[in-house]
Regions:
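Non-catalytic substrate-recognition/targeting regions of SAM-dependent transferases
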Residues: 6-23, 29-96, 103
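Conserved beta-strand signature within the Rossmann-like core of class I S-adenosyl-L-methionine
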Residues: 226-230
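Conserved SAM-binding motif I beta-strand of class I
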Residues: 138-143
């Protein structure tokens, strides 16, 4: 198992009872989320200036309980800067555990000895996009959400990467890949983090069970390497 332990602004404190307790440095605040494994323990009280907890709900969403939490803040990973804010469904706009993947493919890109073209599908707020661009890759960033692509651009600007060769696209990932095949375009690597459920830019419903198999069959036709970031 790879452990994302190089963060200065983030730490996993506990994993128990189907929840996860995390420390995010703003001042300091803590978050407890569902969907992790471990032995149940008693709830911990946060000793920092701002406390945030996501509580288990009947549905997967959960909710935030917080005091003095800003609407937006920044955290840093090496030379990358990310703008975060709490969502109602217990996300912050970043999955810090993915940093181990960023390090892995960043080393591959830097050591390739030639220009590398990367396609990042379901690219969200751009963590993998920025890591690949910072390592020297030409990146095509595709996400169905206009808001998420705009957020990713903000992260790029905050990281000093606005002038890097990043192509920002709001598009249906499956349809985009199908068009790229017809165009004869190729990439050296593909990164994807598909959601289990979502909607396309025109309201199309995405459920991972069906289109994902088709998407894999498409990318295997012309991509040299596939890396899953989930």
């Amino acid at each position: 198992m790879w452990i994302a332990d190089k963060w200065k602004d983030y730490e996993v404190i506990d994993c128990s009872g189907g929840e996860k307790l995390e420390r995010w440095v703003i001042t300091h605040w803590y978050a407890r989320t569902r969907r992790s494994s471990g032995i149940p323990r008693k709830k911990k009280k946060a000793g920092s200036i701002g406390t945030v907890t996501t509580t288990a709900a009947k549905k997967a969403g959960g909710e935030w309980e917080f005091f003095d939490l800003p609407e937006q803040w920044q955290i840093h990973y090496g030379e990358l800067t990310f703008n975060l804010k709490p969502f109602s469904f217990k996300h912050t706009g970043l999955f810090p555990e993915q940093a181990t993947n960023w390090d892995w493919f960043g080393d591959k890109i830097r050591n390739a000895g030639r220009p590398i073209k990367v396609l990042n599908l379901f690219a969200y707020t751009g963590g993998a996009t920025l890591a690949a661009a910072a390592a020297g890759a030409h990146v095509t960033h595709v996400d169905a959400s206009k808001g998420m692509v705009a957020w990713a651009k903000e992260n790029a600007a905050s990281s000093g990467l606005s002038d890097k060769p990043i192509r920002w696209l709001v598009d249906d990932c499956v349809k985009f890949v199908e068009r790229e095949i017809r165009r004869g375009n190729h990439y050296d690597a593909i990164i994807m983090d598909p959601p289990s459920y979502g909607r396309g830019p025109k309201g199309e419903i995405w459920k991972i069970e069906m289109p994902f198999i088709h998407l894999l069959s498409c990318v295997l036709r012309f991509f040299l390497r596939i890396h899953f970031s989930s």
